[in-house]
Amino acid sequence: MPKVKALQCALALEISSVTCPGVVLKDKEDIYLSICVFGQYKKTQCVPATFPLVFNARMVFEKVFPDAVDPGDVVTQLEYDTAVFELIQLVPPVGETLSTYDENTRDFMFPGPNQMSGHHDSNRQVTMRRISGLRGNAPRLEFSTTSVITECLISSRKCHTQDKFIYHLAPVEKSHGRLQNRTSRSQKKKSKSPERSKYCINAKNYEQPTISSKSHSPSPYTKRRMCELSEDTRRRLAHLNLGPYEFKKETDKPPFVIRHVDPPSPRADTLLGSSGRDCERDGWSRVHNDHSHLGCCRPKDYKVIRTPHGRDFDDSLEKCEEYLSPRSCSKPRHSARTLLVHSAPSTMPKHSPSPVLNRASLRERFHSDWCSPSNCDEIHDRVKNVLKSHQAHQRHLYDERDLEKDDELELKRSLLCRDSAYDSDPEYSSCQQPRGTFHLDDGEYWSNRAASYKGKSHRPIFENSMDKMYRNLYKKACSSASHTQESF
């Protein structure tokens, strides 16, 4: 590879201290100074948080300009670069920047108007920005610079530059540190170690972790946020083992889905109500021939009607029979209820039918003839035995007592309604009379319940009442006629 000449600009920076009289920091964490020149970041060692901050650090920044022809071109390109100083305190979680100072790199390296190469300026002072939240003077930075522009070969630039980076990696803390650094530098130049190229490649200071990141363990939230930074920052923070985290945004979450169930149609509701009322009938339950089921009533029958939904049309009727717990057969009751079941849409997965629906009826399972004379006779005999039992007799007495009480209550209610109706309006009294109750005579009332209790029909009672009425009218007419004759 041919060697090409280029111009190299080097800056030797010596930082002595940072002073800020009359200012006391609230936090007591250590402080360090971060410097960025030529796009290269370097930092001093940490010092206690008490002014003045004495650093006594020395560092070198170098950059090669292969396209530059003379030093004037280098100075022109330096005008597009900025030198930045940051005073950082190690306050968790990521540190706090107390004060900053930035200046054009050309003016920072060559403060004079005609100074280009070989400039040395000692005991320089610049005023940094005021610390936010604190009263008092702004921090003042004391340092010295030496700027040099020289020719170099591009092929040997990396090793030459990185060797100087290794030499200036450890800042100077004591007054005799310069002699030690110079001695180590001369020894490194003389020694030709085979690992020299390795140090030159891995000694990039701006890719190393910062002191602030090494001083504390970041929280899980900070880790996720750090993973969202640039690739250069990820490489610089690789020692934290952040992992392949990605901060999830709100837009990445899947939408919350709510299933909507179609309400039953009003037609189905009316069909359900009417069929439920019309199909409910009272009757004696039929008992099976098997003696193991004696004393049990036949369970209610449920008819399942599937209405068409979409393209599914199922008009078949399936009969479901289920056993109920044994109960008294003194008042057996049989009711057939019709259940309306909407079939699921074709897109929805259909559930497997219940095994009860596919089960054969009692007649098919036991092959018995319900209409045979033997079954009918057996049923009548069993019903007679049940009615003659002590339990049925007690229940019959209770029913008679209940009928008497109901008749008395009904008579009292009719009398109360009649009195209240007569007090308000005579015409309104007819509307307030209980339905099916008629006034006969001498405070007697006749109703359907009284007819069933006495065993008489309405016709003879009506004729008797009319006979009494006409007889009374005739007696009154006769008595009135006799009174008039006596008066004359």
UniProtKB/Swiss-Prot annotation:
Start and end residues of each stretch annotated as Disordered: 176-199, 256-275
Residues carrying sugar: N181
Signal peptide coordinates: 1-20
One GO term (biological process): cell differentiation
Domain of life according to the entry: Eukaryota
Cross-link (Glycyl lysine isopeptide (Lys-Gly) (interchain with G-Cter in SUMO2)): K248
Disulfide bonds: none
Phosphoserine: residues bearing it: S217, S219, S265, S274, S325, S343, S346, S354, S424, S465, S487
Location(s), subcellular: Secreted; Cell projection, Cilium, Flagellum
UniProt-listed InterPro entries: SPATA6_fam, SPATA6_N
Alphabetized UniProt keyword annotations: Cell projection, Cilium, Developmental protein, Differentiation, Flagellum, Glycoprotein, Isopeptide bond, Phosphoprotein, Secreted, Signal, Spermatogenesis, Ubl conjugation
Any one Gene Ontology molecular-function term assigned to this protein's record: myosin light chain binding
Stretches assigned to coiled coil: none
Gene Ontology cellular component terms for the protein in this record: extracellular region; motile cilium; sperm head-tail coupling apparatus
Similarity section: Belongs to the SPATA6 family.
Function per UniProt: Required for formation of the sperm connecting piece during spermiogenesis. Sperm connecting piece is essential for linking the developing flagellum to the head during late spermiogenesis. May be involved in myosin-based microfilament transport through interaction with myosin subunits.
Subunit organization: Interacts with MYL6.
Protein's name according to its UniProt entry: Spermatogenesis-associated protein 6
This protein's encoding gene: SPATA6
